[in-house]
Each structure stands twice: as C-alpha cells, then as structure tokens.
C-alpha cells in the first residue's frame, strides 16, 4: 500500500491549472505526505506542486502557432519525460491538452507507470475512434460528462464520470442584482450579454452579426443594455472596432475586460458562440441563443467527410438530448434570425422559468464534487499496484 506516492501532473492550459490545484488539494486528504511535480501554473504551485515548466509554455493555439513553436514544445516534452522518469513517479496525470498529454502518457505507460487522463477529449462529437488511442495511453480516464464513459466502455477502457468542476463552483441560485450593481447596470432594464467567442477567427465570423442582431433587438426593447465581455486582451481591439461600426446606442453598450461570468449573471438573455460558454450560461440558468459560423470551405469538408457525429452543437442541448436553446449555424446565423430568437426569450417569461427548471436538473446531474471524485479514482488506482 502506497503511503507517500510521487505524483506527476501536466496542465497545458489555464483551466487545467485550476483543475490540477483542486485535484492536488483532494489527493492530499488521501496521501498527506505525497509529493507533486509537473507542468502547471500559479494555482498548482500554491497547492504544493513543484513545477518544472509553466503552463503558459504549452499554451499555443491554432495550426500555425503550433508549427512555429513545435521545436520548443518537443524540447519541453523530452526534458520533462527524462526528468520525470528519473524521479520515479507512481502515477502521471495529464489534465486536458490531449495533443501534448496523450503522447507523454503513452510513453510513461509503456514504461509501466500508471497514467490517468483528466478531461476526456470530445469523442462523443467527432473522431470517436480516438478512444482506442486514448486507451493505449492511459489506465483510466476521468470524464466531466455522463455520456462519455459508455463510449469508452465500448472499447474496453476504464473511464469514470466525476462531474464538472464548473457545476461545483456555480451555485444553484444566482444573484442578478449584485452582478448588475458590479457592472453599473440599472436593475430593471432589459440586459443582453453578447459573447461571440474567445478566438480572433470566431469574433471575425460572428462579432458583426451578433452586434447587428443586438442593434435590431434594441429597436424592440427600448432601454436595452448590451454587455460584451472581451475574453482576452488580444480580442478586445477587434470587438471595439466592430462595436464602433454597429447601430447600438453608445450609452447602452458596455465593452468589458473579461468578466464573462458577471456579464452573463447580469443578463436576462445571452447570445453566445457555441462552446464552453454555453455550459456556463446553462449553469447560471440564463436563456440563450447559440450560434456558430466557420469558413464555408471548412464547413463543406466537415459535412462531406461526416466528421461530426452530432446533430446538436450546444452543450446544454447535447446533455439534455433536446433543443433547449435555439442553434443558428452557418447560413442560418443571420442578424434577423438571431434577433427573433432573442426576442422570444424576452417576451415569454413563463418559458424562461420552465427552461431554468430544466437547466437546474442538468446542473444537479453535473454537480458531483469533481475534484473529490477524481482524487478517489486516482487513489483507488494507486492502491491497485
């Protein structure tokens, strides 16, 4: 029975650093004298992990960025593997970032070291056969969504549903008034939150259309306030430029530095790009309209090759197995269509109440004390040695 395990972790993104810190805190309850090393950020270091590389050194996005940084990424991988193997870990835990982590995990598994992958890739959406590669790389997968373990079971892979950390963080009942006060918004006016994505390419595709829809909505809802949280400093100038060309009243338009959660909390309705933000809006119990648009050639390739297995894009709809939030994709993503879908929520409060009750059911399903369950699954694996 291992009393003081050596645990290596790799968090390739800021969200992974957050997950890693919570996991370390819970693992210490099982193993008070455990040692932790790895790749992480400030939160993991504060939790007691000795980091050999920082999470920011792995955080590159897009094919061209990856290619430009590939030599450095490969060097980090080589150095980490060499040092970690010499350190003799009892388990290696890769947190999300599958492009980097699965290769490292497989390398360690081949050397008879237990490996765990925390946060399953979206095999339920596309490229399900990746599950076989994942199974060759890890001893156990820790999943955030309940529909994931049954897919792994078809491939004979040990996968556990631990719940979603965001569902643990967000309370069942949320406070709109406090959020509005924090943003300087009137308590009784209609408020729309606009989130066209976090990447430059997403905002280029969706930003103008979203703002045009908000402008049209303001004609139906006098006194409408629109809050636009910039996901990061890189995308704020583009949003500011798009906003300057929109028809939105200047006095009622609010471009924010980050604060996406506060913006959604303050809003009556959310207009959001398909992605993780839809899950956050659901957990905050906000009615939403979901949209997405990619380059026409990309969309044709995806459709022709049948790369996507799903007929729904928004996470709340996928989790519910029904269309709770309107989805407007590609050619259907027009300002008039978005405006009409948004106006529907503003004009039908009884439907909003019914929707919020359904969102509460999904929230309850996802709230499982994820860090606690993940730590239990890892502790169990360690005791099997």
UniProtKB/Swiss-Prot annotation:
GO cellular component: membrane
Pathway: Bacterial outer membrane biogenesis; LPS lipid A biosynthesis
InterPro entries in alphabetical order: Glyco_trans_19
SUPFAM superfamilies per UniProt: UDP-Glycosyltransferase/glycogen phosphorylase
A GO BP annotation: lipid A biosynthetic process
Molecular-function GO term, any one: lipid-A-disaccharide synthase activity
Coiled coil: none
CDD domains: Glycosyltransferase_GTB-type (cd01635)
Lipid metabolism is among the record's keywords: yes
Leading EC class: transferase
Keywords linked to the UniProt accession: Glycosyltransferase, Lipid A biosynthesis, Lipid biosynthesis, Lipid metabolism, Transferase
Highest taxon of the lineage: Bacteria
Family membership noted in the UniProt record: Belongs to the LpxB family.
Classification via HAMAP family: LpxB
Name of the protein described by the UniProt record: Lipid-A-disaccharide synthase
Organism in which the protein naturally occurs: Xylella fastidiosa (strain M12)
